[in-house]
Curated annotation (Swiss-Prot):
Organism (species): Mus musculus (Mouse)
Transmembrane residue ranges: 48-68, 84-104, 122-143, 167-187, 213-233, 275-295, 310-333
Protein name as it appears in the record: Trace amine-associated receptor 7a
A single cellular component GO annotation: plasma membrane
Subcellular location: Cell membrane
Membrane topology of the entry: Multi-pass membrane protein
Keyword annotations: Cell membrane, Disulfide bond, G-protein coupled receptor, Glycoprotein, Membrane, Receptor, Transducer, Transmembrane, Transmembrane helix
Tissue expr: Specifically expressed in neurons of the olfactory epithelium.
Cytoplasmic side: 69-83, 144-166, 234-274, 334-358
Alphabetical list of InterPro entries matching this protein: GPCR_Rhodpsn, GPCR_Rhodpsn_7TM, TAAR, TAAR_fam
Keyword Methyltransferase in annotation: no
């Protein structure tokens, strides 16, 4: 029997006996149950710090991505096929903050799962669905940016609202179908039945994934990653070439003769740069986790608990990063936030507000 267990996107409750902060004693998750999992509680100080750090991440993911979705869906100036992809990506990150991070906070700090066996499986499915949905969205966004930068004049006719809708539908359907079917058919536990039986206890949320499915999970992350790296490499080369062409003209000539195509290309390059940073942040956040998952599966479950928890929460925190990236690089997003938080969004005709002043 294959005795290697991997966590399907961070949803296994490991005993917290190797934590960064020392535990005070060993207890049971449910004191009156013989089949209860063992927990190692933190002392009050570290416990409060961890709740604050994890809770802040969840709140930022929920509020920040809610602002992104509200901005794009409310203001008509932002109604574009590319921005609809960004709004859908924000929805995935919003759902991570709402349905995954709060429960994982309790699991990570308390060392126990108190939300029932049914939601344990849902929680795992949500993690898988939202993670893969995010990477598929980012992959489509990179293709969108490549078309916009390489051929800005024909871009509006090539990447239409219909194309954007198909990309969004594909990203969500494939992610949800894959994650839920994998866990609810039990395919992930094939060959691990005896080990699962030994590990099962009340207050745990253990999801066993055999080597075959760990490898498939890794491929679902790796293939879109390679596509994005290739596409953004081409975008970088195109942007560099366009910049060199502009530099060949004198400043005075450039002001007089700068074409509509040049202005559009400049705007699209800036958007590509910002979204490229979002892609890089996603890859840097999730790549260590996926590398660790495949190492664990094939080398015998060797990752220390505290290392695993750090990798999981780095990945979770990515859901809170995109709104910060947009706020830093997009003046229109900062203006939209101001209109939303001051309540001006409730005024009549606020949806027609100009977010791009000259």
């Amino acid at each position: 029997m294959d005795k290697l267990v991997d966590h399907f996107l961070s949803d296994q409750s490991r005993t917290m006996n190797e934590d960064l902060f020392s535990a005070t004693s060993t207890e049971l998750c449910y004191e009156n149950l013989n089949r209860s999992c063992v927990r190692s509680p933190y002392s009050p100080g570290p416990r409060l710090i961890l709740y604050a750090v994890f809770g802040f991440g969840a709140a930022l993911a929920v509020c920040g991505n809610l602002l992104v979705m509200t901005s794009i869906l409310h203001f008509r100036q932002l109604h574009s096929p590319a921005n609809f992809l960004v709004a859908s990506l924000a929805c995935a990150d919003f759902l991570v903050g709402l349905t995954v991070m709060p429960f994982s906070t309790v699991r990570s700090v308390e060392g126990c799962w108190y939300f029932g066996e049914s939601y344990c499986k849902f929680h795992s499915c949500f993690e898988g669905s939202f993670c893969y949905s995010s990477i598929f969205h980012l992959c489509f966004i990179s293709v969108d940016r490549y078309i916009a930068v390489s051929d800005p004049l024909t871009y509006p006719t090539r990447f239409t609202a219909s194309v954007s809708g198909k990309c969004i539908t594909f990203s969500w359907l494939l992610s949800i179908i894959y994650s839920f079917s994998l866990l609810y058919t039990g395919a992930n536990e094939a060959g691990l039945e005896d080990l699962v039986s030994v590990l099962t206890c009340v207050g745990g949320c253990q999801i066993a994934v055999n080597q075959s499915w760990v490898f498939i999970n890794f491929l679902l992350f790796l293939i879109p990653t390679l596509v994005m790296m290739t596409v953004y490499s081409k975008i970088f080369l195109i942007a560099k070439q366009q910049a060199q062409n502009i530099e060949k003209m004198s400043k005075q000539t450039a002001r007089a003769s700068e074409s509509y195509k040049d202005r559009v290309a400049k705007r699209e390059r800036k958007a590509a740069k910002t979204l490229g940073i979002a892609v890089a942040a996603f890859l840097l956040s999730w790549l260590p986790y996926f590398i660790d998952s495949i190492i664990d599966a094939f080398l015998g479950f060797i990752t220390p608990t505290y290392v695993y928890e750090i990798l999981v929460w780095i990945a979770y925190y990515n859901s809170a990063m995109n709104p910060l990236i947009y706020a830093f690089f997009y003046p229109w997003f900062r203006k939209a936030i101001k209109l939303i938080v001051t309540g001006k969004i409730l005024r009549e005709n606020s949806s027609t507000t100009n977010l791009f002043p000259e």
